[in-house]
């Protein structure tokens, strides 16, 4: 027979013994006896097979108490909410009917093929600064998004407020500050407080008919670009992306897990953990996945780390590699969409264990250069055309076939679909299923044909209590989950088993023995071995015998008679 608890946290026997409600004698480290770990019971509760009903009830009460704690812990830790975020906005517009000042005002009546370039960003300072005040062109290399010989105008459309910006790309300060972009005209700079900004760019061509435009393949770009803190100059202020940096991608904040220069893939993931793990630590990622830091080894000045990724207790992936600020350890497990970066390792003063600065991500996406992440939208990286140290005159270029780590300033999606040769008022071109490029003639007003970016987007985000996410340029923190919003969580309920079903020699977990030597065979075994002392005169007692159950600790809950055992059980329940 088995006596099961009715419910399903991490809890230790607390020092609530001081309540004084129940008088009980403590032997050993009673307060340190852990009964729940990570939502699961750590001990079997054992009652004698010939025990009186009172002892069986005591065991069931202990099991039920542990079970109720599991239920509360699980409910609090597992409570989450799915939120829907909706955002809509429009950028400034450019009236193509009065865009020019070089003798003719109407762009749409220029010779067919003449081009106009427009840009918007999460903050207008970035879009404004992309237009070169001296040349009138954008700071973009020729034939990347437009043909400079055909360009009639380059215009900033200010901000599209629903685009996203990450204000601190290196929240844990993994990388040391170098000279800031504003101070020197070289690529050798880095700012821990840098920003990453979403931008939209498009080139349209005149059809010389006064009412329609053409949008060519390769003429529209969505981009997420890293900048020096509060400096919006693309030529001087952009900074190279590094593993662990945060950046927005299609309205959500991601961490850069890996720039894979072998397969030319950019891996991005959503942060689960960013902090320090100690050698031997195991971190619960969720969905049955755990990351274990198996070992951190030092040879000279070099550190190597051994990691294991487990699913339901079984190792599904492992990595052993060196780690440093210039060579982070990266581990990606594609079946579980999990990405891990270890940026730095060190030892404690006594040199007997190590630590690793670790980022764990989930929902990892793989952006392969030259491939369509979304139909008609190809993955590119944002680069500069100047590869020497001097970048003061550098311009934006795009790469769709090769990742160059020291020349990657952002990631983008470039339009590679069919040419749109009849783009007119009332039509919209969807940009990466995220934003739109629109034309509006204000009800056929002869002097109006406004070109602008817009967004009307809805995204869902699932958050645990206390978690923060950035969605569509909104920071959202879930402070709590109300009871009626929580779904039931399944746990393995603790069971009271009989002393004939478990032995001290073969136990695979801790044991809680309810009943004295007369009522419980395992308690008698401990008494006969001299590990506890208990007679018919013994008071209510809680005694911990370290390692007595096949190396696992044993907690004896007993007394000299049934009443004393019940009192000991009630004292334990009071302390939990």
Curated annotation (Swiss-Prot):
The keyword Cell wall biogenesis/degradation is assigned to this record: yes
One GO cellular component term: S-layer
Primary location recorded for the protein, binned into one broad class: secreted
Gene3D superfamilies: 2.60.98.40
InterPro entries for this protein: S_layer_C (IPR022651), S_layer_central (IPR022650), S_layer_MJ (IPR006454)
Subcellular location: Secreted, Cell wall, S-layer
Alphabetic keyword roster: Cell wall, Cell wall biogenesis/degradation, Glycoprotein, S-layer, Secreted, Signal
Post-translational modification: N-linked glycans consist of the 779 Da trisaccharide beta-ManNAc(Thr)-(1-4)-beta-GlcNAc3NAcA-(1-3)-beta-GlcNAc.
UniProt GO BP: cell wall organization
Positions bearing carbohydrate: 102, 132
Keyword Cell wall biogenesis/degradation on entry: yes
Domain of life: Archaea
Signal peptide stretch: 1-23
Pfam families xrefs: S_layer_C, S_layer_N
Record-stated family: Belongs to the Mj S-layer protein family.
Chain's role: S-layer protein. The S-layer is a paracrystalline mono-layered assembly of proteins which coat the surface of the cell.
Protein name: S-layer protein
Native species: Methanococcus voltae
């Amino acid at each position: 027979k088995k006596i099961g608890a009715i419910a399903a946290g991490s809890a230790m026997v607390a020092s609530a013994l001081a309540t004084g409600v129940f008088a009980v004698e403590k032997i050993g480290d009673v307060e340190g006896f852990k009964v729940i770990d990570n939502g699961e019971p750590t001990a079997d509760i054992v009652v004698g097979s010939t025990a009186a009903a009172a002892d069986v009830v005591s065991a069931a009460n202990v099991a039920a108490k542990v079970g109720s704690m599991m239920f509360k812990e699980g409910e609090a830790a597992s409570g989450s909410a799915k939120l829907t975020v909706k955002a809509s906005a429009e950028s400034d517009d450019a009236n193509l009917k009065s865009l020019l000042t070089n003798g003719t005002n109407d762009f749409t009546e220029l010779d067919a093929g003449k081009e106009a370039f427009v840009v918007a960003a999460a903050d207008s300072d970035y879009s404004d600064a992309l237009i070169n005040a001296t040349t009138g062109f954008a700071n973009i290399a020729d034939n990347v998004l437009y043909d400079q010989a055909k360009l009639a105008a380059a215009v900033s459309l200010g901000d599209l407020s629903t685009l996203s910006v990450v204000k601190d790309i290196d929240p844990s300060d993994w990388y040391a500050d170098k000279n800031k972009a504003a101070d020197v005209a070289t690529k050798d700079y880095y700012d821990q407080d840098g920003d990453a900004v979403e931008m939209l760019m498009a080139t349209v061509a005149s059809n010389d008919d006064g009412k329609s435009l053409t949008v060519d393949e390769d003429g529209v770009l969505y981009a997420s670009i890293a900048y020096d803190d509060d400096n919006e100059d693309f030529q001087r202020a952009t900074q190279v992306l590094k593993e662990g940096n945060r950046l927005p991608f299609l309205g959500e904040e991601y961490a850069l897990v890996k720039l894979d220069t072998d397969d030319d893939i950019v891996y991005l993931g959503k942060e689960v953990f960013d902090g320090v793990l100690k050698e031997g630590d195991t971190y619960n990622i969720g969905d049955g996945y755990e990351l274990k830091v198996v070992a951190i080894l030092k040879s000279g000045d070099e550190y190597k780390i051994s990691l294991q990724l487990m699913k339901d207790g079984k190792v599904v992936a492992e990595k052993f590699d060196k780690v440093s600020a210039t060579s982070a350890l990266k581990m990606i497990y594609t079946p579980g969409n999990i990405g891990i970066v270890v940026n730095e390792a060190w030892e404690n003063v006594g040199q007997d264990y190590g630590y690793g600065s670790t980022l764990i991500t989930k929902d990892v996406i793989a952006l392969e250069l030259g491939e369509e992440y979304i139909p008609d939208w190809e993955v590119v990286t944002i680069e500069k055309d100047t590869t020497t140290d001097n970048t003061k005159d550098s311009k934006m270029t795009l790469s769709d076939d090769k990742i160059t780590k020291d020349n990657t300033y952002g990631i983008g999606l470039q339009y590679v679909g069919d040419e749109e040769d009849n783009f007119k008022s009332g039509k919209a071109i969807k940009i990466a299923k995220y934003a739109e490029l629109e034309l509006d003639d204000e009800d056929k007003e002869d002097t109006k044909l406004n070109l602008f970016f817009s967004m009307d987007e809805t995204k869902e985000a699932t958050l645990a209590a206390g978690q923060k996410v950035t969605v569509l340029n909104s920071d959202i923190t879930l402070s709590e989950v109300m009871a009626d919003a929580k779904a039931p969580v399944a746990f393995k309920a603790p069971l009271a088993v009989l002393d004939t079903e478990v032995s001290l020699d073969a136990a695979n977990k801790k044991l809680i023995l309810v009943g004295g030597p007369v009522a419980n065979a395992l308690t008698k075994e401990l008494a006969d071995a001299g590990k506890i002392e208990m007679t018919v005169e013994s008071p209510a007692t809680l005694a911990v015998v370290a390692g007595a159950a096949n190396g696992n600790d044993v907690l004896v809950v007993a007394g000299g008679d049934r009443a004393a055992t019940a009192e000991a059980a009630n004292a334990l329940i009071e302390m939990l």
